[in-house]
Amino acid sequence: MNILLLIFYFLVCFLIFDFIKKNKVKKYDVPTLSYALPIIGHLYKLGVNPHRNLTKLVEKNGGIFSLWLGDIKTVIVTDPSINKEIMVKQFTNFSDRPRLKSFESFTGGGVNLIFIDYNEKWPVIRKIVSSSITKTKIISNYKEVIENQTKILINSMRTHSKINEPFKSKKYFGKFSISIVLGIMFKQDNDEKQININDNNIDNDPITKLTEPIQQVFLLLGTGNISDFIKILRPFFKNEYKKLNNSASKVFKFMEEIYDQHLLKFDKSNPRDLMDYFIEYEFTNSPNTTLEEKKISIIKGCMSFVFAGDDTVAATLEWVCLYLINNPAIQEKCYNELISVLGDNNNESKIKFISLKERDNCQYLINVIKEVLRIRTPLPLSVPRIATQNCEINGFFIEKGTQILSNAFGMSHLYVDEPNVFNPDRWINYYNQKQQQQQQQQQPQPIQNNNYFNDLDRVCLPFSTGPRNCVGISIAELNLFSVCANIILNFQIKSIDGMQLKDIEVSGISIHPIPFSIKLISRN
């Protein structure tokens, strides 16, 4: 009985101490939300759509405020100028990633491009990826992979159209996206395996078998594990961590097989793809590590690239189709632009296809994609950072170890006119205005006493900003254009019942719409 009483007193004291700690206000601290509860902090304020609920809190609490996500003190940044200060000007003070248990469980300790801390290795890995993307030969390979996979996808859609079968957007876009990333990662091996998005093997081929564990990882990471934020609950979530490890292990084994084959054909003087660049780096710069350690490091690096590039593109493609279905006039305007660009080169004797070289001539479609990325930012709260040291931002003190979340969704909604209206023309007007100002050699004038308001390039940051932004922006943009352009060129897309689709969000690593099927009407 005495032991039970002692435990009771201990719990009461712990709850009181935790409540005082989380509600204590210091003079120069970032303003903190009131009513942080013991143990859970402000988690109860997040709801099903954290990015939307946090954005609502901005109106009352300002563009920077802090809250407690369980045990983790977190600063939410929605003010674009403060966001630039953190992500660009004081980048080195906010360059590391938080050590969340789920992410460590998945990454094997955080050794990869996304979750690795900003140490001596990260800039090198970043340079490997970015330089490989910009090399002429590799760029040519990337574009070839994207166009080939687009053609395969369009052919599959033609089959659906001919037999009047609903096209399941989530399944096919997910497979397309992973096929692109894998093709870029190790092109030659994928050429030999002939990654195909066709109807005969969509549920049984090796790529689909890889897609399933990847989507499982996205589900487990994206839905949020409360034990990441409340440490005392971790013993009760061992099964969740085990599931995450199992899914990540399946991806690792798939890539291990490709790595072993890849290594046999590796030629240092003639790197073929991104995996070759990782191999070259590890074998050149890690002379004291074993072959097994080198292999693990290379595969983990490749895995990070796959996980970084897969879900966001697939989610954006789903949203583009949803908005085009719900806005048929915009869909037809895109089609007319494509026809105009193709001109006499497009006739009935040829398969309809628009190549990536035409991208710069399709500005309206590019603006449609940008508007989708604005209104449905795939990573609405970006990837979290932590403060690496005590520092000051905008007169506020931020303590070392504080987690930082950049509210990309909030910036693209609170700093534009009519944020909930899907309007690609806003981008056309914006760029016309910028061009006029450049011609007149004028500085942009403040709008509504805020020089960020309606400055779309500075408030719409779907791929983040600064030195640690998304390294694969150019690849993602090419992916999105290639698929969107060729779907619109070949099909009129509608909902199955002819009604508007519901734009309800499903939270995960990226924000998806609820799964929907598409009715494809061939434009031929």
UniProtKB/Swiss-Prot annotation:
Keywords: Heme, Iron, Membrane, Metal-binding, Monooxygenase, Oxidoreductase, Transmembrane, Transmembrane helix. It comes from the Eukaryota. One of its GO terms (cellular component) is membrane. It is found in: Membrane. InterPro entries: Cyt_P450 (IPR001128), Cyt_P450_CS (IPR017972), Cyt_P450_E_grp-I (IPR002401), Cyt_P450_sf (IPR036396). The chain crosses the membrane at residues 1-21. Signal peptide: none annotated. The keyword Transport does not apply. Heme binds at residue 470. Its EC number is 1.14.-.-. It is a single-pass membrane protein. Disulfide bonds: none annotated. GO terms for molecular function: heme binding; iron ion binding; monooxygenase activity; oxidoreductase activity, acting on paired donors, with incorporation or reduction of molecular oxygen. Belongs to the cytochrome P450 family. This is Probable cytochrome P450 519C1. It comes from Dictyostelium discoideum. The gene is cyp519C1.
